[in-house]
């Protein structure tokens, strides 16, 4: 099964998890690049506001095409209880190209379930697996264990229902 791991990361937490997931399932890694300036305190505040208002953003054209992969795993930080504008934009653009999906998120507090539900609605696919990690978990020595469980969940779902995962 060919797998693409797509993610957006402002601070590096989601990148760390995306790299671990891609390594664990021998996947291609694609970082979404938001052209908006989200650095510093002003960028942080703008980011939360844009996420809360379900805004899209301009992203650099992806180097890989979702329709060339059997499974697309999408990762996002949770901003204002939802996905980032870059991930929203990607999921809307690739809605018809994504065959099967799995999601992961990193967060400082809560909002994983709402984030996953919004991602599901946006891309039109029910994820075959999800992984939610706190900032502390994403930086812990147990990260590989969490990721291994996520990959195992994907593999089980794929074996039970190959059409949807």
Locations of the language-model features?
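Short glycine-rich anion-binding loops that position phosphate/pyrophosphate groups of nucleotides
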Residues: 77-80, 108
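Redox-cofactor binding/interface segments in oxidoreductases and associated redox assembly factors
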Residues: 74-75, 103
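Short, surface-exposed connector motifs at secondary-structure boundaries
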Residues: 1-2, 97-102
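N-terminal beta1-alpha1-beta2 submodule of the flavodoxin-like/Rossmannoid cofactor-binding fold
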Residues: 1-74, 81-92, 145-165
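Short, glycine-/small-residue-rich phosphate/pyrophosphate-handling segment
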Residues: 102-142
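Residue-level "edge-of-site" marker
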Residues: 33-35, 79, 104, 132-133
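P-loop/Walker A phosphate-binding loop and immediately adjacent motor/lid segment at beta-alpha junctions
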Residues: 13, 99-100, 106, 153
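Short, conserved loop/helix-junction motifs that constitute active-site signature segments
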Residues: 66, 92-99, 122-125
């Amino acid at each position: 099964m060919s797998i693409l791991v797509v993610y957006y990361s402002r601070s590096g937490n989601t990148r760390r998890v995306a790299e671990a997931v891609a390594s664990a399932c021998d996947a291609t890694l694609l970082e979404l690049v938001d052209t908006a300036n989200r650095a510093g305190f002003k960028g942080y505040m703008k980011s939360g506001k844009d996420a809360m208002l379900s805004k899209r953003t301009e992203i650099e054209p992806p180097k890989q095409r979702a329709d060339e992969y059997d499974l697309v795993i999408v990762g996002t930080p949770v901003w204002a209880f939802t996905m980032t504008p870059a991930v929203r934009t990607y999921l809307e653009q690739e809605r018809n190209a994504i065959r099967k999906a799995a999601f992961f998120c990193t967060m400082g507090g809560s909002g994983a379930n709402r984030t996953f539900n919004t991602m599901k609605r946006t891309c039109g696919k029910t994820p075959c697996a999800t992984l939610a990690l706190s900032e502390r978990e994403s930086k812990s020595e147990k990260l590989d264990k969490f990721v291994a469980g996520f990959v195992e969940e994907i593999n089980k779902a794929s074996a039970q229902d190959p059409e949807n995962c």
